[in-house]
Amino acid sequence: MFRIFKMSFAVIIIILALIAFNYTEHTSVIQSVMLVFLGAVMFMQGLEERKKENDGSGAFNIYTAVFVWSVSLIGFTLHII
């Protein structure tokens, strides 16, 4: 079940990447959306590693996901301004 969820996120990221290459005039918005999905996948990987190892591993993926989400929020804000 969890693997299907992760694979669907990967497919969505690939579709968004194809759209970004086809419509280059709108890439600033699409790149921010792709960063949100990338952050979600990294966050889920971090939670999965943390659950498997039962220690501090996976924290790097979670921190990286938060960083990616903050960059995407900055991208959305700059696009709106």
From Swiss-Prot:
<dbReference type="GO" id="GO:0005886">
    <property type="term" value="C:plasma membrane"/>
</dbReference>
<keyword id="KW-1133">Transmembrane helix</keyword>
<keyword id="KW-0472">Membrane</keyword>
<dbReference type="InterPro" id="IPR025018">
    <property type="entry name" value="DUF3953"/>
</dbReference>
<keyword id="KW-1003">Cell membrane</keyword>
<protein>
    <recommendedName>
        <fullName>Uncharacterized protein YczI</fullName>
    </recommendedName>
</protein>
<dbReference type="Pfam" id="PF13129">
    <property type="entry name" value="DUF3953"/>
</dbReference>
<feature type="transmembrane region" description="Helical">
    <location>
        <begin position="4"/>
        <end position="24"/>
    </location>
</feature>
<feature type="transmembrane region" description="Helical">
    <location>
        <begin position="61"/>
        <end position="81"/>
    </location>
</feature>
<keyword id="KW-0812">Transmembrane</keyword>
